[in-house]
């Protein structure tokens, strides 16, 4: 009787499992199984049911297990757990007898029911419920790493910094480099980017200084005594830069300066323009340009005149401009024209007149 009942129970249990397997077989791949596949499944299911019937019959006959007539594998597992000293509740909760766990262990929104003999202790997870004012600093009420009365009541350490981060700034590696600043770690999340506050110097874009008109703002090269600065840098129309009189003290200015534009390009005394500026007066606004005199030196008001001494006296006669190789001597300051050149003695650069039109119009004018 017991054996027959066991066989019937096994048949019922096997049928249930077999039906599930058949349904799963139909759903696999989204197609209907072929005839040969269905026959193989039936043969496999009949063999499984026969083995399950023998197992249930042996447990009822020799093990003394209280198995219902129509039982499944879960009932057999429950019976085996009861014999081994485990308790299986109707919802499936299993634990050793005498070590019933607490009702529920709430840990930051999740429930964990560890086994009594397990050494696994769930660690609290950090909360990332950010406050409205910042996207990286968690709120104090939801984060377990911030000091809060609720956190201390739940047994969670309210220390805002982890212990191993505390000793990071005091480690030997940081002592080797005393010039490095100490490590400052915020109590919240340190992985999210943080927008610097308005008081931070990095939050404001660097701005150029616009106080160019102030008298105390001077270039770095104005204090130098280099004579090349004055000649190579055109002065501003709004201000007059006076060169250092020290480097002009030893220069002797000549009174003779031909009016030919060609002479100024190869003039033996390019500083003759300074005397013209002195003779005009202190309030003169005459500025010399390379197109007019060949030099780019501003007028220097207030400079005392010097005796007229030719600078060409220190140069050899054979290298002087206008000298003759046949032994002839020419007067100083005269220029001899070469082939194809005309020297305009009677017209200066200021007397030139520009006319437009054809040759007839110019002839009539």
From Swiss-Prot:
MF terms (GO), sorted A to Z: DNA binding; DNA-binding transcription factor activity
Pfam families cross-referenced by the UniProt entry: BES1_N
UniProt similarity note: Belongs to the BZR/LAT61 family.
Key words, A-Z: Brassinosteroid signaling pathway, DNA-binding, Growth regulation, Transcription, Transcription regulation
Polar residues: compositionally biased ranges: 215-233, 356-365
Residue ranges, compositional bias (Gly residues): 1-30
Gene name linked to the record: BZR2
Binding partners and assembly: Interacts with PUB24.
Region ranges (Disordered): 1-45, 113-154, 191-236, 344-365
Taxon lineage: Eukaryota, Viridiplantae, Streptophyta, Embryophyta, Tracheophyta
Region (Required for DNA-binding): 31-113
Domain of life per record: Eukaryota
The protein's name in its UniProt record: Protein BZR1 homolog 2
Function (record text): May function in brassinosteroid signaling.
Biological process according to GO: brassinosteroid mediated signaling pathway; DNA-templated transcription
Low complexity biased stretches: 113-144
